């Protein structure tokens, strides 16, 4: 009886264990199947673009302002999603300035002679003629080398020889010292009259231009410098420079500005603007 009773109970126990294991396996299989199905969109979203309310926003091209966004997207910008309108970068608008840049305040916009309200005193007019003695001296020396002008200038040597001899006896550094003192001490200082400073820098520019022409001509072959071309060239240069210097001296004595093309503009730009 005991063995007969124990046998069905053992069978029932084993069958119940088998039922529990089979039901557990079925439940585990259903759970795994459910988890696999539920995790599938997550895996897809991890490989693709994540579902976000920002994907619903319309794409705004570069340069389009934020006011063109739709009404539905404005809720995301100012609603409960975190106020994203403040996080979007807004580039500042550049305003074009109409002011023209200037290199220096001393450079005038146009080259015009100041109005002569009254005639300068006679001593200022006399001093304004002195800077032209240097280019006149150089012009006379180059004119004497010209074949056509030498016979004519020989009659006036007694007038020019004392001055030319005095200039020739000066030391070699005199011209350099003269230019530095005249430019820094007179031209660039506003204490002197504008009329006097203008004629000082005019004489300096005429002297420098003539020295440059003489230096460049010495680099030419001797056949050109002493030939027929050089003879006509120095005759033309001597006539042009002689009349230019004499016209400048006449304007200085008359109390006027010498209106020499190109040279007067170059002289006026060297003077600080008042």
From Swiss-Prot:
It is found in: Plastid, Chloroplast inner membrane. One of its GO terms (molecular function) is protein transmembrane transporter activity. Pfam families: TIC20. Expressed in leaves, shoots and roots. High expression in mature photosynthetic tissues. Lower levels in non-photosynthetic tissues and roots. The chain crosses the membrane at residues 130-152, 167-187, 200-220, 229-249. One of its GO terms (biological process) is protein import into chloroplast stroma. InterPro entries: Tic20 (IPR005691). Residues 1-65 form a transit peptide. It is a multi-pass membrane protein. Keywords: Chloroplast, Membrane, Plastid, Plastid inner membrane, Protein transport, Transit peptide, Transmembrane, Transmembrane helix, Transport. Disruption phenotype: Albino and seedling lethality. Tic20-I and tic20-IV double mutant is embryo lethal. GO terms for cellular component: chloroplast inner membrane. Involved in protein precursor import into chloroplasts. May be part of an intermediate translocation complex acting as a protein-conducting channel at the inner envelope. Seems to be specific for photosynthesis-related pre-proteins. Partially redundant with TIC20-IV, but not with TIC20-II or TIC20-V. NCBIfam families: 3a0901s05TIC20 (TIGR00994). Part of the Tic complex. Component of the 1-MD complex, composed of TIC20-I, TIC214, TIC100 and TIC56. Interacts with the translocating preproteins. Hydrolysis of ATP is essential for the formation of this complex. The 1-MD complex interacts with TIC21. Belongs to the Tic20 family. This is Protein TIC 20-I, chloroplastic. It comes from Arabidopsis thaliana.
């Amino acid at each position: 009886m005991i063995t007969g009773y124990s046998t069905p109970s053992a069978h029932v126990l084993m069958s119940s264990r088998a039922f529990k294991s089979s039901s557990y396996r079925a439940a585990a299989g259903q759970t795994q199947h459910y988890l696999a199905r539920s995790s599938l969109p997550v895996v897809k979203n991890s490989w693709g673009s994540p579902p976000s309310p920002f994907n619903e926003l319309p794409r705004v091209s570069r340069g389009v302002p934020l006011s063109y966004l739709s009404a539905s997207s404005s809720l995301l910008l100012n609603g409960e999603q975190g106020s994203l309108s403040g996080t979007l970068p807004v580039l500042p608008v550049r305003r074009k300035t109409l002011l023209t840049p200037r290199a220096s305040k001393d450079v005038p916009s146009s080259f015009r002679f100041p109005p002569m309200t009254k005639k300068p005193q006679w001593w200022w007019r006399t001093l304004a003629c002195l800077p032209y003695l240097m280019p006149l001296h150089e012009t006379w020396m180059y004119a004497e080398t010209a074949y056509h002008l030498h016979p004519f200038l020989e009659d006036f040597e007694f007038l020019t020889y004392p001055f030319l001899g005095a200039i020739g006896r000066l030391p070699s550094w005199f011209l350099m010292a003269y230019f530095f003192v005249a430019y820094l001490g007179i031209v660039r200082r506003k204490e002197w009259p504008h009329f006097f400073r203008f004629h000082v820098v005019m004489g300096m520019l005429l002297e420098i231009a003539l020295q440059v022409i003489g230096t460049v001509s010495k680099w030419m072959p001797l056949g050109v410098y002493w030939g027929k071309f050089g003879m006509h060239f120095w005759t033309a240069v001597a006539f042009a420079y002689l009349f230019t210097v004499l016209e400048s001296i006449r304007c200085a004595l008359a109390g006027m500005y010498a209106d020499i093309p190109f040279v007067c503009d170059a002289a006026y730009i060297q003077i600080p603007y008042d």
